[in-house]
Amino acid sequence: MSADGPVVNVHVLFFAKSRELAQTPRSKVDVPSQIVASDLLDQLVTRFDLASIKDNLILAHNESYIENLSDKILFREGDELAVIPPLSGG
């Protein structure tokens, strides 16, 4: 895993199918202050049973989409992370 620095507490928000699978609309999670997005996604998938939608999830850090899962994310205490599956509709 590629993670550095101290551990911080972030607020994770779940939307649509991810909310259903996680069985909660939000959670507080301890994460390294620096972590590669793909490693973070793997941790969330395992902890919240999101494997069935992993390949379709979008992450957003403080309302900014994480577009490249190889990017390192820098977290501060109390930051927000959204877990967003593709939205369907018509």
Swiss-Prot record:
This is Molybdopterin synthase sulfur carrier subunit. PANTHER family: MOLYBDOPTERIN SYNTHASE SULFUR CARRIER SUBUNIT. It comes from the Eukaryota. The modification Glycyl adenylate is found at G90. The gene is Mocs2A. GO terms for molecular function: molybdopterin synthase activity; nucleotide binding. The modification 1-thioglycine is found at G90. Pathway: Cofactor biosynthesis; molybdopterin biosynthesis. GO terms for biological process: Mo-molybdopterin cofactor biosynthetic process. This protein is produced by a bicistronic gene which also produces the large subunit (Mocs2B). Heterotetramer; composed of 2 small (Mocs2A) and 2 large (Mocs2B) subunits. Gene3D superfamilies: 3.10.20.30. Acts as a sulfur carrier required for molybdopterin biosynthesis. Component of the molybdopterin synthase complex that catalyzes the conversion of precursor Z into molybdopterin by mediating the incorporation of 2 sulfur atoms into precursor Z to generate a dithiolene group. In the complex, serves as sulfur donor by being thiocarboxylated (-COSH) at its C-terminus by MOCS3. After interaction with Mocs2B, the sulfur is then transferred to precursor Z to form molybdopterin. It comes from Drosophila ananassae. Belongs to the MoaD family. MOCS2A subfamily. Signal peptide: none annotated.
